[in-house]
Amino acid sequence: MGSKFSEYISRAASVEGFFLEQAAITWDCLLNYQSSHYIKGNFLEIGVWKGKSAILSCLHANPEETCLLVDLIMFDEAQELLKNLHSNSNFYRCKSQNFWQNEANLHQFFSSCRWIHIDGAHSGSACFNDLQIANQLLSEEGIICIDDFFNPSYPQVTAAVFNFLDQFPFSLKLFLCGFNKGYLARPYYCDNYLRYLLENFHNDLSMINYSGKITLYKTSRPGDFNCFGLREYQGKDFVGLDEDGSKILI
């Protein structure tokens, strides 16, 4: 499908919301990876508000893919904007737990979503509940993105994520974090995303004139914690092990 980043920046510029540019470019690269590897599936966003991040999901969605957009407080202009971008969008003005309980046909979306963004209520219990929903809907090759991960304003979100990962280690793993987001995938598919980040992520950034702006950190060995971290550019594309910064092990 190709990068949608430039179009996203243009369309989202006037939309109120909180979505860092570096997070948007990371989404764009990961969604391009999915498209180039023929990974298809639906999209779920819990917490839409005015639609700033959902714009990027709608731009990447293929016509046959459904965007499920859930928010108790969803603005009419957001609904109109997103529907115009992707006509195959379903809107649910409710709490996420009510969406889960009341949508009679939700079973058709089980294990079908390739991209899920959790940005709903920010209590620990709400985040844990949303992860339960996401775990049911995520496909084998999909990604769950958690908003405000490692944000010191919401430590309960980070705690809820690690609590969930501890309880369900065979369901999800953290493979990437940074710029206010955490990224989870199925354990047996994480290696593919880790390899992409190591081998092609920065190439993709350079193709859309975004090189020299993000550094990937991999300061641990796979047996310790197999996850990349994203930071603003530190003069190099990668930082590896503390004992040898040139060594990246996945």
What kind of region is each of these model predictions?
Residues 1-117, 121-145, 149-250:
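A short alpha-helical cap/connector motif
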